Curated annotation (Swiss-Prot):
Annotated organism of origin: Homo sapiens
Entry remark concerning the domains of this protein: The C1q domain is essential for the function in Wnt signaling.
Expression tissues: Detected in all tissues tested with highest levels of expression in brain and spleen.
Coiled-coil ranges from the UniProt annotation: 129-156, 194-216
Principal subcellular localisation of the protein: membrane
Region (Disordered): 67-108, 382-614, 642-753, 922-975
Localization per record: Cell membrane
Protein name in UniProt: Caprin-2
Protein residues bound to Ca(2+) 2: 1084
InterPro entries per the UniProt record, alphabetical: C1q_dom, Caprin, Caprin-1_C, Caprin-1_dimer, Tumour_necrosis_fac-like_dom
Function summary: Promotes phosphorylation of the Wnt coreceptor LRP6, leading to increased activity of the canonical Wnt signaling pathway. Facilitates constitutive LRP6 phosphorylation by CDK14/CCNY during G2/M stage of the cell cycle, which may potentiate cells for Wnt signaling. May regulate the transport and translation of mRNAs, modulating for instance the expression of proteins involved in synaptic plasticity in neurons. Involved in regulation of growth as erythroblasts shift from a highly proliferative state towards their terminal phase of differentiation. May be involved in apoptosis.
Length: 1127
């Protein structure tokens, strides 16, 4: 059992190595005697090889060389010191004391193995020979120079003449030294090959021994495990079935030992501890020691186990007959059970297919039955008292549920899932007339409506061929709107609806036939709805106007219902009233019209307006005269969706007739839902003239909430008397998404924009900045200190005409864009939102068209004026503790549309716009402003509506006065509202995370000559330590934040004959290194640098691998680093 390692081959290899070494030492002795005639010689002592493991190495008895001749031996001192230098690279533990031990003595005494000693000795000898050859070549060149001088007639001194006579001898010595170098190189290569071969063979022998041990342990474990079986014990007790006879006493020893080595799992111990105990038993067994165990010794157990293994019984353990008989019935039982299972599955599948054929019924009716079981949690409380009608319906429809399983379209699985969702909604017909319709339900209805049209078309074609539609109308006379909601709830994929615009037309042509009788009794709710537009429009007419008016009349109910809903539900509810193919055309009426850019027409839409801007304006004015009252739908700020997920390629969709029921209905609802979302400070546009600006923001992003920007501006005078109180009297408070916070919104006279924060992630990127900020609690939110209402006044120092409400549409055509903003800026009043970033460009509404000033496309830059104006920003810490900008209120604009000059007492700034670089915020302390313009500056800043940051969905920023007269503190998302004549482009100002300021520079003022290898370099002078990240005591830089760092180091070598090696370390890894040595005792600099990507907690330091560093008060040796880019 005990493994014996044969070392005969290893000894043979090492003996050959010694022979090579002896030959090499003989040659080297001759060479050194010839090279160094006046110096002591190397004494190479090789004792007889007692064993391969202990090889006494070369010893050198002498001090380093000292040579007398100035001509040829000036570098021989260097040769001796080089021999002491190289060993330190590998294994020297004695420092740099050049006079203590001889170099080879110190090297060989510290060598870890004979091979390392051989390699070091050979390498030093070759270096010595190389230097001798170089010296002879120098001497040869000098002698050639002497000969040339003699030929030229120059007189030489006697020493020079004697040296010239030895020229031939020098040539001979040089040739001999070169040949000797070749011989030594060959010998050293052979020696190293023999060494490596011997090491490889030794390693293989060790590996085989380890494998044999492991194999033996596994065999023993197998034997001990099988000894626990009764029939195996009987065989050994009786010597049956080829087993060796064992006395019961010895068998008991083995059984007890098997319980120790192969124990059952002990839960009180960890697996590692338990296996460690077992391994100790196995180890002692392999050793065969005389230790006592289970009443005997390990040596005795080892003998017994060897006897069992050699018997051959365990090669194939015989199985008793009883065990075989038991195994057969078990297999038969398993087969029988599997057959039964297959038969049961077949019968179940047959029954299921029969039942599917039996219960094929129309697809619409099952919705009423199953809705009672799959009721939504939102509507459960309102429907508890109305559960009797479904039983009567169910009695009439016993065979309904299975119709859904018979659908054989490719998307049958999807329709099954849709049916369950649609069944949930069928009971909602009982509360069509109730004002307390859940807004969340309305949001879900609308998001599902747009993608359900293709399935609706299929289902309607099936239902028309059967008598079910008429029966369904008779059964549920009140459920027309509820049915549409059911159809809308069938789909969960809102991204599909823009692609399906073309498919909408067919169902709209089919459905009004079956819906018209029921709609005649419901059209009296609102007189503006005179013509059924489509199935969705008809179904929503009776429900929505009532619920909106009731919401206004009783705000308590609307507040409680809204508190559970995100702001998106308002925009969605409004958008859902209109068919999809007319929802897009309506945007022409509701957004600014000064955008003559050619656009793509959406699929399935129709436009009756000409493309020419002037003709379009005239046509719209003619159409407006046909409506009761005048509606200002002239603003065309269109959101340009450039996402690949959106199939709407429009930046200016075609228009619909403003007088259509769609437009009038939208006018009522959108004006009523003003400020339903968190308002944003916007530039007050003279187009509105004290109008009610509503921007229902919706999203077509992948988050599932699909909405679109709509802006409807309804002058107060143009609203019909019956609708004006509901739309203007008490606007509903907006809901902050996720936090259920109510905000008080300004009255309808203020010009503001509502922005939904969450869905902006997928819109076109203006500034790709996403700085997540921690949410704040509700109690931190304060009301705005500004008055909720104001009167917009226009103060201008020029003689130009006051702004008009309708302007020629040629204005933006003349807008000049700077080169860098062409990609991101949209002159049509686009509101760009992306990735938590917002940039709002209001419509340019000047009386005299003039080019807009270019602005700097830089992240976080505030875009200001170009001529004579100035942009003043002031760092201000907002209530949330985040840095933003403090922008001053705009002064009355001058005729060229720029800011008028602010007079500062302390200092003046140039009129050029300030461009900000990344992560840099300009901070100017404000001096006192002149009293004249301050009185008139209120007009541009009266609107103090609160704002919701795109970075924080559930909190509000409060805009508070900074207390410095007209200065106003801007929160990170405030956008200034300036005078209408000022052509200013306010931009979202991001709360960018402040980059850390990290930089350090350290130096040494004293020499560093450690006695051992690989020592850290510690600095004694700190020139700079910005950020307190460099530990002077340890000489280590601790990375404070993830980012890209730059490190530079310069180390001046001490004037010794030892080369300098310096490593730049990250933790314990060598990144870059520097080396300095020319072989002469002189100062040289080892330097390098690196640009590294570090993570927080990484440590950067310098390691002196070998050599010595020079230090002085002039600080030659330095180490510096700084943060380049923060992640």
């Amino acid at each position: 059992m005990e493994v014996q390692v044969s070392q005969a081959s290893l000894g043979f290899e090492l003996t050959s190595v010694e022979k090579s070494l002896r030959e090499w030492s003989r040659l080297s002795r001759e060479v050194i005697a010839w090279l160094c005639p006046s110096s002591p010689n190397f004494i190479l002592n090789f004792p007889p090889p007692p064993s391969a493991s202990s090889v006494s190495m070369v010893q050198l008895f002498s001090s380093p060389f000292g040579y007398q001749s100035p001509s040829g031996h000036s570098e021989e001192e260097r040769e001796g010191n080089m021999k002491s230098a190289k060993p330190q690279v590998n294994h020297s533990q004695h420092g740099e004391s050049q006079r203590a031990l001889s170099p080879l003595q110190s090297t060989l005494s510290s060598a870890a193995s004979p091979s390392q000693a051989y390699e070091t000795y050979i390498e030093n000898g070759l270096i010595c020979l190389k230097h001798k050859i170089r010296n002879i070549e120098k001497k040869k060149l000098k002698l050639e120079d002497y000969k040339d001088r003699l030929k030229s007639g120059e007189h030489l001194n006697p020493d020079q003449l004697e040296a010239v006579e030895k020229y031939e001898e020098v040539l001979h010595n040089l040739e001999f030294a070169k040949e000797l170098q070749k011989t030594f190189s060959g010998l050293s290569l052979d020696l190293l090959k023999a060494q490596k071969k011997a090491q490889r063979r030794e390693h293989m022998l060790k590996l085989e021994a380890e494998k044999k041990k492991l194999r033996t342990i596994l065999q023993v474990q197998y034997v001990l495990q099988n000894l626990t079986q009764e029939h195996v014990q009987k065989d050994f007790k009786g010597g049956l079935n080829g087993a060796v006879y064992l006395p019961s006493k010895e068998l008991d020893y083995l059984i007890k030992f098997s319980k120790l080595t192969c124990p059952e799992r002990n839960e009180s111990l960890s697996v590692e501890d338990q296996m460690e105990q077992s391994s100790l038993y196995f180890w002692d067994l392999l050793e065969g020691s005389e230790k006592a165990v289970v009443g005997t010794t390990y040596k005795h157990l080892k003998d017994l186990l060897s006897k069992l293994l050699n018997s051959g019984y365990f090669e194939s353990i015989p199985v008793p007959k009883n065990a075989k008989e038991k195994e057969v019935p078990l297999e038969e039982e398993m087969l029988i059970q599997s057959e039964k299972k297959t038969q049961l599955s077949k019968t179940e599948s047959v029954k299921e297919s029969e039942s599917l054929m039996e219960f094929a019924q129309p697809e619409i009716q099952p919705q009423e039955f199953l809705n009672r079981r799959y009721m939504t949690e939102v509507d459960y409380s309102n429907k508890q008292g109305e559960e009797q009608p479904w039983e009567a319906d169910y009695a009439r429809k016993p065979n309904l549920p299975k119709r859904w399983d018979m659908l054989t379209e490719p998307d049958g699985q999807e329709k099954k899932q849709e049916s369950f969702k649609s069944w949930e909604a069928s009971g909602k017909h009982q509360e069509v007339s109730k004002p307390a319709v859940s807004l969340e339900q309305r949001k879900q209805d609308t998001s599902k409506l747009r993608s359900t049209l293709p399935e609706e078309q299929k289902k309607q074609e099936i239902s028309k061929s059967k008598p079910s539609p008429s029966q369904w109308k008779q059964d549920t006379p009140k459920s027309k709107a509820g049915y549409v909601q059911e159809e809308q709830k069938k789909q969960e994929t809102p991204k599909l609806w823009p692609v399906q615009l073309q498919k909408e037309q067919d169902p709209k042509k089919q459905t009004p036939k079956s819906w018209t009788p029921s709609m005649q009794s419901e059209q009296n709710t609102t007189k503006s709805w005179t013509t059924p537009m489509c199935e969705e429009q008809d179904s929503k007419q009776p429900e929505t106007p009532k619920s909106w008016e009731n919401n206004v009349e009783s705000q308590k109910h609307s507040l409680t219902s809204q508190s559970q809903i995100s702001p998106k539900s308002w925009g969605v509810a409004t958008a859902s009233l209109i068919p999809n193919d007319q929802l897009l055309p309506r945007k022409l009426n509701t957004e600014p019209k000064d955008v003559p850019k050619p656009v793509h027409q959406p699929v399935g839409s129709s436009s009756t307006l000409p493309k020419d801007p002037v003709l379009r304006k005239e046509k719209l004015q003619d159409l407006m005269t046909q409506i009761q009252g005048t509606c200002n739908f002239m603003q065309e700020s269109v959101l340009d969706f450039d996402k690949p997920s959106s199939a709407i390629p429009t930046s200016q969709p075609p228009s619909a007739t403003p007088g259509s029921p769609v437009a009038s209905k939208e006018q009522n609802l959108s004006s009523q839902s003003d400020f339903l979302q968190e308002p944003l400070q916007a530039t007050s546009s003279p187009v509105t003239c004290s109008s009610n600006a509503c921007l229902v923001t919706t999203d077509q992003a992948s988050s599932g909430s699909e909405t679109e920007f709509m802006t409807s501006e309804t002058p107060e005078a143009a609203i019909p008397p019956g609708k004006q109180p509901s739309s203007l009297a008490s606007p509903n408070p907006p809901m902050a998404k996720g936090s259920e916070q109510g905000f008080q919104s300004p009255p309808a006279s203020s010009s503001s924009v509502t922005i939904n924060t969450a869905p902006f992630q997928a819109m076109q990127t203006v500034f790709n900045v996403n700085a997540p900020l921690p949410p704040r609690k509700e109690q931190e939110i304060k009301e705005s200190p500004y008055s909720p209402g104001y009167n917009q006044s226009f103060t201008t120092a020029s003689t130009q005409t006051p702004p008009q409400c309708q302007l020629p549409s040629i204005h933006v055509e003349q807008t000049v864009h700077s080169q860098e903003t062409a990609a991101n800026y949209h002159p049509d009043g686009t509101i760009q939102v992306s990735n938590g970033s917002l940039a709002f460009y209001p419509a340019q509404t000047n009386v005299f068209p003039r080019p807009t000033q270019p602005f700097v496309n830089s992240r976080g830059s505030v875009r200001g004026c170009t001529r004579g104006g100035r942009l003043i920003t002031n760092s201000y810490r907002s209530p949330g503790g985040y840095k933003g900008f403090d922008t001053y209120r705009g002064l009355p604009s001058i005729s060229n549309g720029n800011y008028s000059q602010l007079q500062f007492q302390a200092r003046e700034y140039s009129g050029a716009p300030y461009s900000q670089r990344d992560n840099f915020q300009q901070c100017y302390k404000r001096g006192g402003t002149s009293g004249g313009p301050r009185a008139n500056s209120r007009a541009g800043w009266s609107d103090s509506s609160q704002v919701s940051s795109p970075e924080r969905d559930n909190e509000t920023f409060n805009s508070g006065d900074s207390g410095q007269g007209d200065s106003r503190s801007m929160t990170p998302v405030d956008v200034p509202v300036t005078n209408p004549a000022a052509t200013i482009l306010p931009v979202h100002v991001y709360p960018l995370p402040q980059q850390m300021r990290v930089a350090f520079s350290a130096a040494r003022t004293s020499n560093l000559a450690p006695g051992t290898l690989d020592q850290p370099i510690v600095f004694d002078l700190l020139l700079n330590n910005l950020g307190e990240t460099f530990d002077l005591q340890l000489g280590r830089f601790n990375c404070p934040v993830n980012g890209t760092y730059v490190f530079i180091f310069h180390m001046l070598k001490l004037a010794v004959n030892v080369p300098l090696y310096v490593n730049l370390m990250k933790n314990e890894e060598v990144l870059v290194s520097a080396y300095a040595n020319d072989g002469a005792p002189d100062h040289e600099t080892a330097s390098n640098h690196a640009i590294l990507q570090l993570f927080q907690g990484d440590q950067i330091w310098l390691r002196l691998h070998r050599g010595a560093i020079y230090g002085s008060s002039w600080k030659y040796s330095t180490f510096s680093g700084y943060l380049l880019y923060q992640d």
